[in-house]
Design a protein with these regions (language model features):
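Conserved acidic catalytic loop of the alpha/beta-hydrolase fold
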Residues: 73-90
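Conserved alpha/beta-hydrolase "acid-adjacent" motif
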Residues: 240-246
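Flexible "cap/lid" loop of the alpha/beta hydrolase fold
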Residues: 116-147
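Gly/Ala-rich beta-loop-alpha elbow adjacent to hydrolase catalytic centers
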Residues: 94-98, 102
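Short beta-strand/loop motif that positions the catalytic acidic residue
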Residues: 227, 233-235, 239
């Protein structure tokens, strides 16, 4: 399900907001879209947070900038979203490929960002690993996306195990145990299955995905040393999508940051891990203390 297209000073954006309380902008990863943002923000209670979720440029209903498809333009679009909603200052919750524009927003408009949560986030030059033939089919074709949806309904455990193995280095008994743990937890199972429907690199996500790959490979510096807000970094040590080195190096440069390392955590650890509920509660507390 899509969302309204809102006109801002920096361009059109697919956008929705709900809840009341501390404003939080949710910046999805690569690939993704507003549906991925909804899966990300499910841990934020609507009676405590004003949740602002969107599709980044090139994903679903948000077009790429006609003249500027840069990371900085995306950061300016996030600021324009705040303007359009009458929000002076907000926290930002970014995952994976949402990291670069979130960091640049904090650099370019520091007065607008109260705090930043960066989960398994890209923080420097990044080149995505070459996809396998099976990944090209599953994520890059309509037939592959249909198959993932079919399996999510008929064999959800297979989808969950595939997602965990594809996003981390754990194997064998550890993978089986983690899969069983996720399948036994309704929230974690639902989160992984929701994300599985948002990771296509074709169709309405293709332009955003290809733009992200080009932009991330060309990163020189995101100027993290200029970020002035408190930053909470969260990363799984077994992440094979965005290596934990990205968060270690960001933590070393950011003026005010905390780093939580999730033992044997995959790229999905914030949502699918034995410690996920505890980490999510720490994140809510961080937002409340730095709003």
């Amino acid at each position: 399900m899509g969302a309204p297209i809102v006109k801002t000073a920096a361009g059109d954006v697919e956008l929705e907001e709900r809840g009341r309380g501390t404003p939080v902008v949710v910046v999805h990863g690569s690939p993704g879209g507003i549906d991925a943002g909804r899966a990300m923000d499910r841990f934020l209670p609507e009676d405590r947070f004003r949740i602002i979720t969107l599709s980044r440029p090139g994903y679903l209903g948000t077009p790429l900038g006609a003249d500027d498809a840069s990371i900085d333009h995306e950061a300016d679009l996030l600021a324009a979203v705040l303007d359009s909603l009458g929000v002076d200052r907000a926290s930002v919750f970014a995952w994976s490929g949402g990291g670069p524009s979130a960091y640049r927003l904090a650099v370019r408009q520091p007065e607008r960002v109260a705090s930043l949560i960066a989960v398994a986030a890209v923080s420097a030059r990044y080149e995505a690993p070459a996809p396998s033939a099976s990944d090209r089919f599953l994520f890059g074709t309509g037939a592959g996306q249909w198959l993932i949806g079919f399996l999510a309904r008929r064999a959800p455990g297979q989808v969950v195990e595939g997602a965990l193995s594809g996003e981390g280095s754990i194997r064998g008994d550890e993978l089986k145990a983690l899969t069983a743990s996720v399948m036994a937890d309704p929230e974690q199972r639902a989160a992984v299955l929701a994300f599985s429907a948002t990771v296509g690199t074709n169709g309405a996500r293709k332009a955003g995905w290809e733009n992200d790959l080009a932009n991330f490979a060309a990163i020189g510096s995101l100027e993290l040393d200029r970020v002035r807000c408190p930053v909470l970094l969260i990363h799984g040590e077994a992440d094979t999508d965005v290596a934990i080195d990205f968060s270690h190096s960001a933590h070393a440069v950011l003026p005010e940051s905390q780093l939580i390392v999730m033992n044997q955590g995959t790229h999905l650890a914030f949502y699918a891990d034995p410690n996920a509920a505890d980490i999510q509660e720490k994140t809510r507390a961080f937002l409340a203390a730095n709003s």
